[in-house]
Amino acid sequence: LKTITHPYDFVVIGGGLSGLCAAVTAARQGIRTALVQDRPVLGGNASTEIRVPPVGATQCNFGFSRETGLIEELFLNNLLRNPTCSPEGWNLELESLARNEPNLELFLNCAVCKVAMNDAGDRVTGITAYCSMEETWHEFVAPYLADCSGDGVVGSLAGAPFRMGVEARSEFNEPMCPDEPAPDTMGMSLHMHARDAGRPVPFTRPPWVDLELGPDDFGPYRPVCEHFFPDTGGFWWLEWGGALDTVHETRKIKDEVQRITLAVWDYLKNRSPLAERLTTYELDWMGAVPGKRESRRFEGDHVLTMNEIDEQAHFEDAVAFGGWGFDHHPPGGFHDKLNPSTHQYLRGPHNVPLRSLYSRRISNLFFAGRNISATHYALSSTRVMLTCAQLGEAVGMAASHAVKSQLDPRALTEGSAVRSVQSDLLLADHHIHALEMPVIGDLAPRAKVTASSVFSESTAAESWGIDRLSDDRLLQIPVASERLDTLSLRVDADRDTELTYRFHQGPTNGSTFPEDQLAEGRIRISKGSDQWIELPLQVDIPRPGWHFL
């Protein structure tokens, strides 16, 4: 077979959002970069093959913590050029992001099979990937590599130490862990999509799908009928395989999840309360590649823990942030009648240190994505794709500094070296939670902002919906001024009544938990609709940021 050797400064393995962001970031810093992907498309779990919606910090109430930098650029371009958000249009945006970079070469359909090591066995000198489309071996030689492949194929072949399964509670004192370690991971999912064909379309369950489901098979936690129409991501619980080896038994897991998915469609189509409504619907797409949540987690100089995420721990070498809660899935998936996800929300956004993004043993190997140095329960937060994209961007920037300075990843975690990485990340519109530092060349601190229009009472919409105050409510608002005298609310009252209120400041860590109370009071409200009432707060604001009513 034909063999081609490619010399690069930096090679990224894995074309999901983490690998794509790592490769593009490094290339934009002038680094000759290769992106090696074993699938025909980019995007990983967000690709047209799997179609999991990317989520991140803003889905958990951190309203001004949307992931910025490269992933924001990608999303804005997708909205501009793919306004209907079609899967194929999204695929084109992903590939265009890579192909538009002159310093980046994309190698699709190339599966890594071998790694070459130095004599000491602590450094990867090259990798070999096979492209079946052209019956060619591609050898990549580079001083630095990033394994963003999810399963960590390069790290595994190189002998980098890793973890799988759940740690014992005693190892890191994580409260959700069992007393003893367990091999269980979170399972894999297949998504499906149906369309209205405009005429009756029958569906017959294939004979090999020997699973006939009824309403009792879904239990109280899987509202299959409620999910079908409003939410394209509603079938994330079509999941299984966490009790198996999520690397070496992927084919077996995929077959069973496909069987479950077809059985669910058979129930929806033929026997569910939606059956009559779905008479004209046909299954027009089903994933052929399972979306993975968890497999290997490679050990770095620091293992990120659940407690550090929950406590918003400070790291001098912080390079990326996350905000998704602890989202743990039972290993039995669909066949386990427990709640398919135990989701514990966070106090606020948290950071990830650079020391968790490289191997502690292989000196030139970075990691980004779901294979980073984290515990099982920490990964249940960091594994979501917008967080992974942030990790990839951080690794790409760190790799560019490593190439230019000829330093290994470990040497970038302290002093001026890590501050330089952080500064360049901030200049690229990347976000690191609660990090404030001067950035050379940053024009934003001196910029002036003007507005073409101002929102006022007269321009308010007639209604944004009604939030009834029969129970307590918490309103989260940003306050930038040094004093707040009044706060106006628009209310409807079906009788004369009284409103009790308290006003709290927020914490300094970006959390959405109220802290010290600044004001309280009661105000009479007369019967009537569409009234603006003023709460006389009369308070000094100790610090700008989140406040709560």
Which ranges hold each PLM region?
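Short edge beta-strand/loop segments characteristic of extracellular beta-sandwich folds
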Residues: 488-492
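Conserved N-terminal/central alpha/beta ligand/cofactor-binding core
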Residues: 7, 25, 31-32, 37-118, ...
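Cofactor-binding loop segments of dinucleotide-utilizing enzymes, especially the Rossmann-like FAD-
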Residues: 15, 38, 370
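Long, compositionally biased intrinsically disordered regions
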Residues: 547-549
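Beta1/beta-strand and adjacent pyrophosphate-binding region of the FAD-binding site
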Residues: 3-16
